[in-house]
From Swiss-Prot:
Organism name: Escherichia coli (strain K12)
Catalysed reactions, semicolon-separated: isopentenyl diphosphate + 2 oxidized [2Fe-2S]-[ferredoxin] + H2O = (2E)-4-hydroxy-3-methylbut-2-enyl diphosphate + 2 reduced [2Fe-2S]-[ferredoxin] + 2 H(+); dimethylallyl diphosphate + 2 oxidized [2Fe-2S]-[ferredoxin] + H2O = (2E)-4-hydroxy-3-methylbut-2-enyl diphosphate + 2 reduced [2Fe-2S]-[ferredoxin] + 2 H(+)
Protein name: 4-hydroxy-3-methylbut-2-enyl diphosphate reductase
Pathway: Isoprenoid biosynthesis; dimethylallyl diphosphate biosynthesis; dimethylallyl diphosphate from (2E)-4-hydroxy-3-methylbutenyl diphosphate: step 1/1; Isoprenoid biosynthesis; isopentenyl diphosphate biosynthesis via DXP pathway; isopentenyl diphosphate from 1-deoxy-D-xylulose 5-phosphate: step 6/6
Named cofactor requirement(s): [4Fe-4S] cluster
A Pfam family that the UniProt record links to this protein: LYTB
GO annotation terms (biological process): dimethylallyl diphosphate biosynthetic process; isopentenyl diphosphate biosynthetic process, methylerythritol 4-phosphate pathway; terpenoid biosynthetic process
């Protein structure tokens, strides 16, 4: 059985930065460090940080005075940010800079009183944070997930309208929603390029190439990871059996029985150790050496806040 590895796969710059912020805060300040929401959507990462003293909470009221608080990579609303400011807390922001860019687009529209439409998944923390940047009662902020939502939507002023997107969406699905928005509201204004981030786009492109060759595709990622779910859906849409797995223990032998080629990829919040474990398990089931496919090279790095720029090896 041939094993193919998608390229790129796994950690993106925003996830790397967010995890480093929590790790460095633990090294400098010691446990406990409070993190609002899972810093990234990966069970292995969250469990390992929890073991080292990170406490994951959903409400600022759960954080004691004088504590260290970190906002997750998904970003937070202005209301959450203001609540944290009103408390005696030291706050570090692990929001992905590409999410912050979308926040700034929404804030600009809010200041101008223009209505805004966000393409995204209801209930996702990134969507909640992005919607929470809009505060102008003269305008309005709306969420759509599908072309059907667009056709049902009514706004106050079609002449002054803009749209933004969640950063971890399906490129193909989002294109369909944008097409519907432009037909429904001909004067709507959007970003020069949709807000789907480079890592999401690259990983979807890579899984498309992977699924062209593999009979079965394994996506390493947690069930609550938006970008990981989109990878599995894309492979399935291409007619391949695809499974979203947290780790090697989730692999069922019958998935790869009599399969000649299996493909492996990982969502942007899944560490490479999990991919290595999956490859090792596939090799136990008869797989050969893992062969990486060619793909886009990624060299983007996002710096951590200057207060946390320390070599953690220097910290006792």
């Amino acid at each position: 059985m041939q094993i193919l590895l998608a390229n790129p796969r796994g950690f993106c710059a925003g996830v790397d930065r967010a995890i480093s912020i929590v790790e460095n805060a633990l090294a400098i300040y010691g446990a406990p460090i409070y993190v609002r929401h899972e810093v990234v959507h990966n069970r292995y990462v969250v469990d390992s940080l929890r073991e080292r003293g990170a406490i994951f909470i959903e409400q600022i009221s759960e954080v004691p005075d004088g504590a260290i608080l970190i906002f997750s990579a998904h970003g937070v609303s202005q209301a959450v940010r203001n609540e944290a400011k009103s408390r005696d807390l030291t706050v570090f922001d692990a929001t992905c800079p590409l999410v912050t860019k979308v926040h700034m687009e929404v804030a600009r529209a809010s200041r101008r009183g223009e209505e805004s439409i966000l393409i995204g998944h209801a209930g996702h923390p990134e969507v909640e944070g992005t919607m929470g940047q809009y505060s102008n009662p003269e305008g309005g902020m709306y969420l759509v997930e599908s072309p059907d939502d667009v056709w049902k939507l009514t706004v106050k002023n079609e002449e002054k309208l803009s749209f933004m997107t969640q950063t971890t969406l399906s490129v193909d699905d989002t294109s369909d929603v944008i097409d519907a928005l432009r037909k429904r509201f001909p004067k709507i204004v959007g970003p020069r390029k949709d807000d789907i981030c480079y890592a999401t786009t690259n990983r979807q492109e890579a899984v498309r190439a992977l699924a062209e060759q593999a009979e079965v595709v394994l996506v390493v990622g947690s069930k609550n990871s938006s970008n990981s779910n989109r990878l599995a859906e894309l492979a399935q849409r291409m007619g391949k059996r695809a499974f979203l797995i947290d780790d090697a223990k989730d692999i069922q032998e019958e998935w790869v029985k009599e399969v000649k080629c299996v493909g492996v990829t990982a969502g942007a919040s899944a560490p490479d150790i999990l991919v290595q474990n999956v490859v090792a398990r596939l090799q136990q089931l008869g797989g050969g050496e893992a062969i990486p496919l060619e793909g886009r090279e990624e060299n983007i790095v996002f710096e951590v806040p200057k207060e946390l720029r320390v070599d953690i090896r220097e910290v006792d």
